[in-house]
């Protein structure tokens, strides 16, 4: 087994990652495979925080004519559903897991309290952050960057459908070029599809590296933590 590059990580999953080929809802086989990969990190002594998107349940911008604020709050509820699903999968494997939400839902989750989240991580518990930042107009990418800064994560592990960052869509263009490493400024100036600009800027300001990799094989989560070069790293360079 290789040496762990990171002590504390923030795993960012899209909601679609939980949906699998269905594209909608939650595929519990996939949730379980992700949970098994996260358990491996915990067993290696790595502290894991996670943020899950909500696009498998609700895509706010697809709500044509709907008030943006209302749509965003619906998205926050969707992320909380996903957080509970992932918590259930992890706990079925014996991994102590806490869900903390930015909007209070005391019957099902803890409210987000930074000091409590840090304490959970130090005790080896996985902490899943739900409901985004609790504010409309901010994406779950931004929530992941914000929580990563707050819990002092060493890196954001950004799980995607593609195996890194390309200069154009590799699904549409055969000549798409993959980057092994990029700076935050290059991502922002070239408008590359990593995180949205708010999240990228937050990572840049707080010097949090972003490691982009494909989740087609959940084992990749462990591989990137052990330093295998299978994705794209975004950092100060």
UniProtKB/Swiss-Prot annotation:
Q: Where is this region: Involved in allosteric activation by GTP?
A: 20-25
Cellular compartment(s): Cytoplasm
Recorded metabolic or biological pathway in which this protein acts:
Pyrimidine metabolism; CTP biosynthesis via de novo pathway; UDP from UMP (UMPK route): step 1/1
Single biological process term from Gene Ontology: UDP biosynthetic process
The record ties this protein, via Gene3D superfamilies, to: Acetylglutamate kinase-like (3.40.1160.10)
Binding residues for UMP, per the UniProt record? 54, 72, 133-140
Listed InterPro entries: AceGlu_kinase-like_sf (IPR036393), Asp/Glu/Uridylate_kinase (IPR001048), Glu/AcGlu_kinase (IPR001057), Uridylate_kinase (IPR011817), Uridylate_kinase_bac (IPR015963)
Q: Where does this chain mainly localize?
A: cytoplasm
Q: How is its activity regulated?
A: Allosterically activated by GTP. Inhibited by UTP.
Q: GO MF terms on file?
A: ATP binding; UMP kinase activity
Tell me any Pfam family this protein matches. AA_kinase
Which SUPFAM superfamilies has this protein been placed in? Carbamate kinase-like
The EC number of this protein is 2.7.4.22
Reactions it catalyzes: UMP + ATP = UDP + ADP
Q: Got a GO cellular component term for this one? A: cytoplasm
Which positions in this protein are listed as binding ATP?
A: 12-15, 55, 59, 166, 169
**Keywords, ordered alphabetically:** Allosteric enzyme, ATP-binding, Cytoplasm, Kinase, Nucleotide-binding, Pyrimidine biosynthesis, Transferase
The signal sequence is none
Its function, per the record, reads: Catalyzes the reversible phosphorylation of UMP to UDP.
Of which family is this protein a member?
A: Belongs to the UMP kinase family.
Q: How does it assemble?
A: Homohexamer.
What is the protein's given name? Uridylate kinase
Lineage of the species this protein comes from: Bacteria, Bacillati, Bacillota, Clostridia, Eubacteriales
